[in-house]
Amino acid sequence: MTDVIIIGGGASGMLAALTAAESGRSVLLLERQSRVGRKLLATGNGRCNLTNYHAAPDRYHGEDGTFCAHALQEFDVGATLQYFASLGLLTVSEDSGRVYPMSNMAGSVLDVLRYALERPGIEVRTGQVVTAVKPAAEGFAVKTETDAFAARRVILAAGGGAGSKVGGVMDGYRLAKALGHHRTVLYPSLVQLKTDPTYPRALKGIKAECGITVRRGSDVVAENRGEVLFTEYGVSGPAIFDISRAVSTGGEGLICQLNFFPDWERREVLDWLRLRRQTMGAHEASTLLTGSCHTRLGQMLCKAAGFTNQRAADLTDGDLERIARQATQFELPITGTCGFDQAQVTAGGLRTDEFDPQTLESRLVPGLYACGEVLDVDGDCGGFNLQWAWSSGHLAGQLL
């Protein structure tokens, strides 16, 4: 009988396997894909943003905002980087706190983990779709589509539904439910937003630094600031990812409001437009924002205000006010998100009040543990979700 079976060979599952083996336990890691760590290769645009120096409970979300605290403290960013250094991974950090492999290749992170999994005491079996986990006399009986195994303990590290094209599945929730556990409602998070495509489609590929406000009527649902990328279907970029959770859970009737002059007061924008009217008077109104933003974006904002072919000199102060409003409160009706297929993480998961935050052991089924995305913990964009994977995998792997 194996000491522990780990279901899921993603980031948290691999860390759990390595941690359990370090204490001398025999480990069987079951992964449904043809290789472990497939989702890692897609993180950080292929660079793998493996952690963030600002990782702390206030960067995470879920019904219990403090549930992640012990795991993050027990295996913090410093311990994580020291651990990966021991595996041979060199890293670099950015001013934002994001940490990447020095190679700028996600494959480097996966490779050092895969080599580490070759240590004695760990058996990795890929292509194993787990169909059932049942308590048995001395532990658990675990069945897959092709085999049956027995273990004294089980760690559920099956991930969430996000990124289904690179391995996201709902298996973990199904297996936990059969054992009496419950989950919250699931939403896609860290995902692109779909909006009325009229203007974004014309601006496809353009990036802009913006203040971002999501509203329902006069109510503010979410706020952020950062880089926004216009796409054929709406908007994307790190700043959009961080508000996407609020959009996913916020229901209908939402509007994304963009401020292309986030450091200016409206009156300052208006004063500047008056000056531009003087200097660009002989030119078309659509040139007024030239020099302040991408040419196509400036033209679009003037068009949205209702001005295209008019001479700049012919614009009234009221006309300039309309342009200033578009430049500081440009509105895009939100029609949804790009869903779980494109999402980087699942918001929601197994209810954390059914697990001990000091050990990640189930309060309902002794000997069952859970870690990573399958739990109701999701972080902001920027390496926070991988830090949760490492921290929770390390804690669960101790089998306390």
Label every model-predicted segment.
Residues 1-12:
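Beta1/beta-strand and adjacent pyrophosphate-binding region of the FAD-binding site
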Residues 5, 21-45:
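Glycine-rich FAD pyrophosphate-binding loop
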Residues 5-7, 30, 130, 149-165, ...:
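Short hydrophobic core segments
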Residues 34-36, 41-42, 50-57, 90, ...:
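An anion/pyrophosphate-binding glycine-rich loop and adjacent beta-alpha core
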Residues 47-93:
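Glycine-rich active-site loop/strand segments that organize a redox cofactor
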Residues 126, 298-378:
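A glycine-rich dinucleotide-binding beta-alpha-beta segment and adjacent secondary-structure elements
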Residues 126-139:
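A conserved short coil-to-beta-strand element within the FAD-binding core of flavoproteins
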Residues 153-199:
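Glycine-rich loop(s) and the adjacent beta-strand/alpha-helix scaffold that form part
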